[in-house]
Structure formats: C-alpha cells, structure tokens
Amino acid sequence: MALRLILGFDYGTKQIGVAVGQVITGQARELCTLKAQNGIPDWNQVEALIKEWKPDAVVVGLPLNMDGTPSDMCLRAEKFARRLNGRYNIPFYTHDERLTTFEAKGERRDRGGQKGSYRDNPVDAIAAALLLQGWLDENTALFES
C-alpha cells in the first residue's frame, strides 16, 4: 500500500500534539492539540481525526534520552502507538523526537507567538509537525511502494 497521508502524534501525559503530513509534498503541518489525562486521550476525539483525515499510517514520537537510550516515557508512547494500531487498524511508525519541544518553542517565538508559559500556550502540535517532518525526510523510500 502506498503511503499518502500520515498523522503524527507528539505523545504526552497531559497533551498530545497532532500533525498531518502529505507524502506527495513531503511536508508536515500542525493540526491540533488533544487533552489527555495521565496519558489517556479522549479516544472519541482521536477517532474523529482518524475518520476525517483517513491516514494511511501514523507516526508517534519517541522521547529518547539525549544519549539515545529509551526514556521512561518511551514505553508509554509505544503503547499509545500500538493502541492506535489496535483500535483503527492503521500501520504505525515511531520517530525520535528529541528536542522537538525545545525547537517548537523557538519556532513559536520566531513566528511572533506569545512567550507566556508552556501551560498557557502549548507547542505540542508544532512539535508533532517537527517530528513528522523529520520522519518524512528520513523515510522517502517507503513512499514508492
């Protein structure tokens, strides 16, 4: 199956950033931020996104430690990816998301966004777009099948 449209998720315990990427353009953009309670999203909201966008695959960011080893959150992010696959029968991929939140804060600042607290002005969707863009850039061979 050729991949055309992909949703990217920046998994977190309080918020989950969502981005959409198109293989034909090789571009990702932020979509929205979902609330989560202890890492559990409102699955109805997730399902609505899946039905609306009809992705061919999903990419979930892995918050690796700076030395490349898995962080405690990696297990939870991988579990979230498996749940997406189990609920919606969509192939999933994972991608190193180190420093995407830091980079997203800088991008928001460069766009003239508020410099307020992270809680008041989250950057999760920007981080999701950055990790999905990284995945798109590194996996062009998958798009040719």
From Swiss-Prot:
GO MF terms held by the record: nuclease activity
UniProt xrefs under Gene3D superfamilies: YqgF/RNase H-like domain
GO CC aspect terms: cytosol
EC main group: hydrolase
EC number of this enzyme: 3.1.-.-
SUPFAM superfamilies: Ribonuclease H-like
UniProt superkingdom: Bacteria
Chief location: cytoplasm
Localization in the cell: Cytoplasm
GO BP term (any one): rRNA 5'-end processing
Keyword field: Cytoplasm, Hydrolase, Nuclease, Ribosome biogenesis
Family matches, as HAMAP family: Nuclease_YqgF
Role description: Could be a nuclease involved in processing of the 5'-end of pre-16S rRNA.
Family named by the database record: Belongs to the YqgF nuclease family.
Name under which the protein is recorded: Putative pre-16S rRNA nuclease
Organism of derivation: Pseudomonas fluorescens (strain SBW25)
